[in-house]
Swiss-Prot record:
It is found in: Cytoplasm. Belongs to the archaeal Rpo11/eukaryotic RPB11/RPC19 RNA polymerase subunit family. It catalyses: RNA(n) + a ribonucleoside 5'-triphosphate = RNA(n+1) + diphosphate. This is DNA-directed RNA polymerase subunit Rpo11. InterPro entries: RBP11-like, RBP11-like_dimer, RNA_pol_Rpb11_13-16kDa_CS, Rpo11-like. The gene is rpo11. NCBIfam families: PRK01146.1-3. Keywords: Cytoplasm, DNA-directed RNA polymerase, Nucleotidyltransferase, Transcription, Transferase. GO terms for biological process: DNA-templated transcription. Pfam families: RNA_pol_L_2 (PF13656). One of its GO terms (molecular function) is DNA binding.
Length: 95
């Protein structure tokens, strides 16, 4: 995964998330929407063949926190949820 910043303003961040597709992009988008400071979050894949693994994100906040802070919080939430799933599987498998 590689992040390429396209546009950065006070409360707006646009970036490509290279190496990912709808699977992770949709998860990130959903978690971003859980943050009360996010006024807009969305992504598009500009060309279904040429850019299939390069979603373009736009994140806008209310200005109380930066888009970078929102993304950091979202990444941590995704990590925590993945860890919870792993722990649940370990419990089921008796590990």
């Amino acid at each position: 995964m590689r992040i390429e910043v396209i546009k950065r303003e006070e409360n707006v961040l646009e970036f490509y998330l290279e190496g990912e597709d709808h699977t992770f992009a949709n998860l990130l988008n959903e978690v971003l929407h859980e943050n009360e400071h996010v006024t807009f979050a969305g992504y598009t894949i500009e060309h279904p063949v040429l850019m299939a693994r390069k979603p373009k994100f736009r994140v806008v906040t209310d200005g109380k926190i930066t888009p970078e802070q929102v993304l950091e919080e979202a990444a941590q939430k995704i990590f925590d949820r993945a860890r919870a799933v792993l722990e649940a599987w370990k419990e089921v498998l008796g590990e």
